[in-house]
Amino acid sequence: MVLEAVLLGIVQGITEFLPISSTAHMYILAKLLNLHVPGRFFLSSVQLGTSFALILYFFKDVKGIISETSRSIYSFIQFGIRQKQEKRNEYTRLGLLLVTGTIPVVLLGFLLVRFVPDGFFSAARNLFTMGVALIVFGLLLGFADALFRRKKGNIFQITFIESVLIGAAQIFAIIPGVSRSGITITTARFLNFDRQLAVRFSFLLSLPVTFIGGMYGLVAGPDTDYYSLGYSLIGAIVSFVVGLLVVSALLRIISKTTFVLFVYYRVLFGLFLVIVSFF
């Protein structure tokens, strides 16, 4: 069981941040190696592990967003003015962009949970659907990355409409194989973000949803999960360490190349899943 928790933690740490779908890989690994398919509590634990990896890697940004946004709100309430420092304005704006980007996916998620039958989500978790999603959204990423070359690399160049569009795009990630980071990076590239800004904004935008979602899964308490609290903790620690390494590596890689390798991988892996689904 320890080995299973470690393997699933490694897969989560690697695939959560790469635009290749963590859900599909966790599911396939469990099937191929005949592991127990992880339940809500374990998945929430490893999700929090990767969330804390992001918080640590972007600690300066997270700290700046929280402190300067709070200070600006307090200043506005007290004096009706904004802070003038350039860095403070950047963090304040980034905080507001993340809020506006989070609101649509929360609202859409609530509507889905409220009105879409539970059977839809379980029915979508099959090899064929995952394979098609990997291929289609992989090609979209490649198209956006190749076609839209205009550089938008500054926080001040991001509009609130763009943050809403990128945030709303996260809802597609409920389809196994889409990839939350993949769809947000793709949308950002369609909006002419350069690769570094697209990845940075995508990762920061994921924090509110993944952190709150992970905490909710833990607060809801252990389900009938095969993995106990101890094994869930092991998975979370492993996903944290691996996730931290992957974030650092990805940001270095995209500063020198395109997303083409991820596109090739998604298409080939997707084709494999589609073919296997017929046997």
Swiss-Prot record:
It comes from Tropheryma whipplei (strain TW08/27) (Whipple's bacillus). This is Undecaprenyl-diphosphatase. The lineage of its organism: Bacteria, Bacillati, Actinomycetota, Actinomycetes, Micrococcales. One of its GO terms (molecular function) is undecaprenyl-diphosphatase activity. Catalyzes the dephosphorylation of undecaprenyl diphosphate (UPP). Confers resistance to bacitracin. GO terms for biological process: cell wall organization; peptidoglycan biosynthetic process; regulation of cell shape; response to antibiotic. It comes from the Bacteria. It catalyses: di-trans,octa-cis-undecaprenyl diphosphate + H2O = di-trans,octa-cis-undecaprenyl phosphate + phosphate + H(+). The keyword DNA repair does not apply.
